[in-house]
Regions:
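Bacterial N-terminal signal peptides
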Residues: 7-21
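A catalytic-pocket lid/entrance helix-loop region that shapes and gates access to the active site
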Residues: 30, 292, 317, 321-389, ...
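Accessory cap/linker subdomain of secreted extracellular hydrolases
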Residues: 139-196, 200, 204-209, 266, ...
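N-terminal cap/lid segment of alpha/beta-hydrolase-fold proteins
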Residues: 201-244, 616, 620-622, 680
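Cap/lid segment of the alpha/beta-hydrolase catalytic domain
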Residues: 238-306, 488-497, 653-655, 664-667, ...
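C-terminal, loop-rich substrate-recognition/catalytic regions characterized by aromatic stacking residues
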Residues: 396-397, 485, 492-757
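Short beta-strand/loop motif that positions the catalytic acidic residue
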Residues: 439, 445-447
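Active-site-adjacent alpha-helix of alpha/beta-hydrolase-fold enzymes
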Residues: 455-473
Length: 757
């Protein structure tokens, strides 16, 4: 798998071996008075003296750890030849013991050690020696291995310097150092010395390496409709295309600088990275996002299929907007399109500008940043736009009067507000209904439990399988958010420590899938069924034939008031005697203008919100698996004709911590819960039942002793529409339509169902 360089630079620049602790002579103390700064010219000599004293006495019962530490000590002591021999012995041991080749950072260090040895033995400059070692290593690597190693070799040295400084700070005002901290310092120094020495040398060598391996066309103008062109970068693997034709991986993006067109080429494909017209030349831009992309993609696919280097097969990939373009192209069924793989694909009308039919003000910011007026000087920071939201919210004006700025973005946003239902305006850009059954190609969708993009990702997946139960469409979902859905879960994020098995590289998994879909390789162990999910807390990837199969077994919990002021209950049985709970919310109140939900995934306390009620189970006596979508029936009486509801699930651990099972919360407009195409208003003052199914998937193992907690409330936030419940178009409502506070009486027929395979 590819190293997670862009996600975890600090991991790459840590010591050569993690947790490399000696088991012998740990009590040894060494006199040591280092300079206080990692960049002090006197530090190398001080560390060399320290290393020279440790090498003769250092032993460790763990031979792998011993060899790794010994190599760092030998390099620091100025003996690269001995360090080279230690690295060779370590590599042989890893291959014989674990059956694996050295990791990327170990190869980088081996190149550095070889260069220092050549410098000493042949009396040449380090730059010359490094070039020799670099070329000798890279000439034996295939394109993919070379691409992987490039990510490691470009790691910055500054975090390494910080690691050295941290170790020095621990020795402040001390005159002796124990063996363990001495090894920590030596390893940190060895890494810093290596990377800082090669930092200025690697880029010219990598450029030459790319020229040797790839044919690159930086600015290709591909003709599309209306006399316009799509700007594309095309990278082809030189060896493969000189020997024959290859399949192509096409990706549309809003910013070519944010993507590496060489990535697909390293996997053996012709790589075409195309700039969506909405982000291209002003004269050729369509009037709004989404409008031309499907037809443009079809034209680009047809063009690719006619090129002499193309074997006629095109796979599409993309994240966010690029994922939308792939699906918009699939709607048009171009013959050469053979597979699509997307991560958090956008779906206009589903997750932008609204989710759960509730329009989000962030959609306006997104349009504005894409279509800024000439000479725009609007601050591009969260605080500015947050103030924008709060000023509108406090004003009580209708959403139609949201304070947009001059320019085309305002026109687009207001036009979108005219279509609150998922009607033909939105349907025209994507497969709809039975059109999904015509998408008869392999599809992969990647998303995360903590990603806002999960809403659209699950929409594509469920609709495709709904209209074609035999669709070749796989879902890969784990504890990822918007930032990590491509790069994988880090060791910790937002207060949460993901399971070890979740720390995969979804990007590498996507190319493994392409090798299966386009190349006929065996399917990967990770993506071996239609639903592939990491059960957080269980440290295990699981697989199911469908969401329906996964959700076949459900556990029902009734929402019940608890006597005596204790927490409301999620009860396994419905009470015989009728009961109810009443929630109220003053829609005129604006004291909450600054409130936003915490992005932390583990909370010490849940936020107290007017109109929100908490329900919890008894502690579970054994671990409980929860995997699938939350569903249920809300049995209630309300004094309004509509309401926006919000639901959230937590695990309340015996430690008192609340762990989110998904994020963001599931918010939805009640009048669209049954049908996103047609609005069905509520009946004020009448008891009614509202079935619902969350657009969020859960994959979590509740610990023994934990409780399941449901937060059920009324959605009212400064950064989205406010539904005042009058029954009018919500964008037309203002605070004048609020009238009496919302009053919902939750009857004891309300229940949720938890899928528990």
């Amino acid at each position: 798998m590819r190293p997670l360089l862009t996600t975890f630079p600090s991991l790459i620049v840590l010591a050569l071996v993690l947790a490399a602790r000696p088991t012998v002579a740990a009590a040894q103390e060494f006199g040591f008075d280092p300079p206080p700064s990692a960049t002090d010219p006197a530090l190398p000599a001080a560390l060399r003296d320290l290393a020279e004293r440790i090498v003769p006495i250092y032993t460790d019962d763990d031979s792998t750890r011993y060899l790794a530490n010994l190599a760092a000590l030998q390099m620091t002591a100025g003996d690269p030849a001995a360090a080279h021999e230690s690295r060779i012995a370590l590599d042989k041991r890893l291959q014989s013991k674990e059956g694996r080749s050295p990791a990327g950072r170990a190869i980088v260090y081996a190149i550095y050690v070889q260069a220092r040895m050549t410098e000493a033995e042949e009396h040449v400059s380090f730059a010359s020696a490094f070039r020799q070692a670099f070329r000798a290593t890279f000439e034996h690597l295939d394109d993919l291995a070379a691409d992987d190693l490039e990510a490691w070799i470009l790691a910055p040295s500054e975090p390494l310097r910080e690691a050295v400084q941290h170790e020095l700070d621990l020795q402040h005002d001390k005159h002796e150092i124990a063996l363990e901290p001495a090894l920590d310092l030596v390893r940190a120094w060895a890494s810093f010395e290596a990377y800082s020495s090669i930092e200025s040398l690697v880029r010219p060598l990598l450029t030459a390496e790319k020229e040797r391996r790839y044919i690159v066309d930086e600015e290709v103008a591909i003709p599309v409709a209306d006399g316009a062109t799509i700007a594309a970068t095309i990278v082809r693997p030189r060896a493969a295309t000189e020997n024959g034709k290859v399949a192509t991986v096409l990706e549309f993006t809003l910013d070519r600088s944010s993507r590496d067109a060489r990535e697909a080429a390293a996997h053996g494909y012709a790589s075409v990275l195309a700039l969506a017209r909405i982000a291209g030349e002003l004269a050729a831009r369509p009037r709004a996002p989404f409008e031309s992309d499907g037809d443009d993609a079809r034209a680009v696919i047809d063009w690719i299929a006619q090129q002499p280097w193309s074997d006629g097969r095109v796979g599409m990939q993309g994240t966010g907007y690029g994922g939308f373009v792939a699906w918009s192209a699939a709607k048009r069924l171009p013959p050469a399109l053979k597979a699509i793989a997307t991560s958090d694909p956008m779906a206009p009308g589903i997750d932008i500008p609204m989710r759960g039919r509730i329009v989000l003000s962030s959609a306006y910011r997104w349009i504005y940043e894409m279509l800024p007026p000439p000479g725009d000087a609007t601050p591009n920071d969260a605080a500015h736009w947050r103030k924008f939201d709060e000023e509108w919210y406090r004003s009580g004006r209708s959403y139609r009067e949201f304070p947009t700025l001059p320019g085309p973005a305002s026109v687009v946003f207001r036009r979108w507000l005219n279509y609150p239902s998922y009607d033909r305006f939105w349907q025209k850009w994507l497969p709809f209904g039975a059109e999904f059954a015509k998408v008869d190609i392999p599809v992969l969708t990647v998303t995360g439990y903590y990603s806002a993009g999960q809403t659209a990702a699950l929409y594509y997946f469920t609709e495709h399988h709904k209209y074609d139960p035999n669709a070749n469409h796989a879902l890969l979902i784990g504890p990822f958010d918007e930032q990590t859905v491509e790069k994988g879960a880090p060791p910790s994020a937002r207060g949460w420590i993901p399971d070890e098995v979740a720390r995969i590289d979804p990007n590498a998994a996507r190319y493994e899938w392409f090798a299966h879909a386009l190349g006929g390789d065996e399917s990967s162990e990770l993506i071996r069924d239609n639903v592939n999910y990491e059960l957080t807390g269980a440290n295990e990837w699981r697989h199911a034939a469908s969401l329906g199969a996964l959700e076949q077994k459900r556990t029902r919990f009734y929402l019940q008031a608890s006597p005596g002021g204790t927490a409301n209950a999620l009860a396994a049985k419905k009470r015989k005697s009728p009961s109810s709970l009443t929630a109220t919310l003053n829609l005129r109140d604006r004291k909450d203008a600054a409130w936003r939900p915490s992005r932390e995934l583990v909370l010490d306390v849940l936020p107290a919100r007017d109109g929100t009620m908490l329900f919890m189970t008894e502690p579970f006596s054994a671990p409980v698996d929860v995997a699938g979508r939350l569903s249920g029936v809300l049995d209630f009486t309300i004094n309004k004709q509509d309401v926006d509801l919000v639901l959230m699930l937590y695990e309340l651990r015996s430690s008192g911590e609340y762990v989110k099972l998904f994020d963001p919360a599931y918010a939805f407009r009640a009048s669209y819960a049954k049908d996103r195409v047609h609005r069905h208003l509520l009946v004020a003052g009448v008891r009614q039942q509202l079935p619902f199914q969350s657009e969020k998937m859960v994959g979590h193992q509740l610990q023994a002793g934990s409780r399941l907690v449901l937060a059920l409330g009324i959605n009212k936030r400064a950064d989205s529409q406010v539904n005042y419940g009058s029954g009018k178009d919500v964008s037309e409502e203002s605070i004048a339509d609020a009238h009496a506070p919302v009053r919902i009486r939750w009857h004891d027929g309300s229940f949720i169902e938890i899928p528990s395979p």
